[in-house]
Amino acid sequence: MSRFFIKGRIRYEHSFRKTDTGQLSFITNAKDDSRKMIYKMNDKKKEKFMKKIISLLLLVTILFSLIGCSSKKGTITIAVPNDSTNEARALLLLESNGIIKLKEDATITATINDIVENPYGIEFKEIEAAQLPNYLRDVDYAIINSNYAISAGLNPITDSILIEGGGSYYANILAVKDGNQENPLVLALLAALNSRQVKDFIDKKYQGSVVSTVENLTDGYDASIDYSALENQTITVACSPTPHGEILNIAKDILASKNITLDIKEYNDYIIPNTVVEDGTILANYFQHLPYLEDFNKNNNTHIVSVGAIHVEPMGLYGGKQTGLDKIYDQNK
């Protein structure tokens, strides 16, 4: 029986044959006759040799299988916001998609300690909300607020794997210190944000990744306000850059037509915009949803109130090391 194999540019032929003494000869001949190797072994040695080869092949096969399983079944990591209301919001998104289960009495301040079922063995990493896009490369998934996703160049509609509905429970609000709700400057800013111009801008600019929640649209102005008395005055408002700062620029143009200046102060965190309103440095802010504000007031003894909901930013699950949910669902296979 003969076999051929190629090594480099030389074609080899090898064959087994029995000698007159009953030994098995393994003969390898180079096609160019430059080499000839003859290995002789008796039947017992041949059998022992073949068993070793088979055992080695089985061992290699098992090792590769284990490596494959290890890669497939590795721990899944999901990064979530570390502030209480947004962490709860992220966990509720996972629960609504059957990935985890929370305690029955879990509220909008639920944390990972309220998880009662974690069938896929997910490891959670609690990260400051604004930093979540920067952690995508280090985790399998991250749950990110739309404003931070947009700022990082992500499209919440096309890039998210899971996304909230457009309900207004987490609508972003215009907020002021308690006692300033009827301030004419505040009412003028609210009317501008409730305008058809702002809604049209949101619809066109964000294509569903930010959704207006205003039901009673205005022309940009409040008929109860004496705008002439507000001429040459300045409204200060704290916000996050995207989308709040962009939306406020539309309101700025509306107010400018009445000779009112809107001074927009942008911040990249969730703390300062509230502290500057509380201490009176800034008149209003526009960056947060009501559950976050209520929790902030409770924990910081502040007195900030909502004067109106403007838009909602659906929170989404984004892929880091993963591009779909297969890694999660494959855990139980």
What do the PLM-derived regions correspond to, one by one?
Residues 65-68:
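C-terminal motif of bacterial Sec signal peptides marking the signal peptidase cleavage site
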Residues 72-87, 91-93, 187, 195-200, ...:
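A conserved helix-loop-strand patch within extracytoplasmic ligand-binding domains
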Residues 74-79, 230-242, 260-266, 333:
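Short, well-ordered beta-strand elements
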Residues 83-87, 229-251, 270-272:
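Extracytoplasmic "Venus flytrap"
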Residues 89, 103-110, 187-228, 333:
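Ligand-binding clefts/hinges and TM-proximal coupling segments of bilobed small-molecule sensing domains
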Residues 106-134, 264-275:
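Short helix-initiation/N-cap motifs at beta->coil->alpha
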Residues 128-129, 137-140, 144-150, 241-242, ...:
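Beta->alpha turn/N-cap motifs
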Residues 150-190, 215-223, 307-319:
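Periplasmic-binding protein-like
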